[in-house]
Amino acid sequence: MIKKRVIPCLDVKDGRVVKGIQFQSLRDIGNPVDLALFYNEAGADELVFLDISKTEAGHDLMIEVIEATAKQLFIPLTVGGGIQSLDDITQLLNHGVDKVSLNSSALKHPELIRQASEKFGRQCICIAIDSFYDKDRKDYFYTTHGGKKLTDVRVYDWVQEVEHLGAGELLITSMHHDGMKQGFDIEHLAKIKQLVNIPIIASGGGGNAQHFVELFQHTDVSAGLAASILHDQETTVEEIKDKMREGGILVR
């Protein structure tokens, strides 16, 4: 049985870690390098670093900050945000990044997924999907540019396509749950997992340790992402893992 992962997420804007609710009302959390070191020592299984400032403007990769962050870690580091090309991916991997997360660029240029997986190995390629539930259409649709632009692409179709193109992992953020701390979108995540065979990281809604237990008891996702509850010290990685053990879930 595969051990489940708990992954802190650093949403970085202009060199600072920020957090909001449903992608809005961002507030400053701290220095990404300091937080990376903290979570590395706190028992995190991996770390996700998302440069959300690059969803609005195509500025250069935040290489210095990313490299400084990677040097603090003895756990895998995934970086996403504004990655547009194989050269961008090469640069990140050469500066200590273990996996890259593609979002809007994957939808714009789906062949980038195939090219990247063939060049670097699919284990390096994570596809991030910001999923929005449209009440009128009663379905989930893919959003781009940090959740600001709604597309007509059904999430359930897109996850299957990116797996076929060579994605090695999915990072699914349920936008209507993001920052709400009311639990993960269990039904949505379970349905996605039925459609694909690659690992899924669940994001959006984790408000306490019990929510992670429920996530892993009711879905077969591989990992749960946490941000504000860890940044605000409402719980810790170890408390989440202890609760998971009590629930009979294997942890690393």
Q: Where are the model-predicted features located?
A:
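Conserved anion-binding
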Residues: 12-14, 18, 93, 97-172, ...
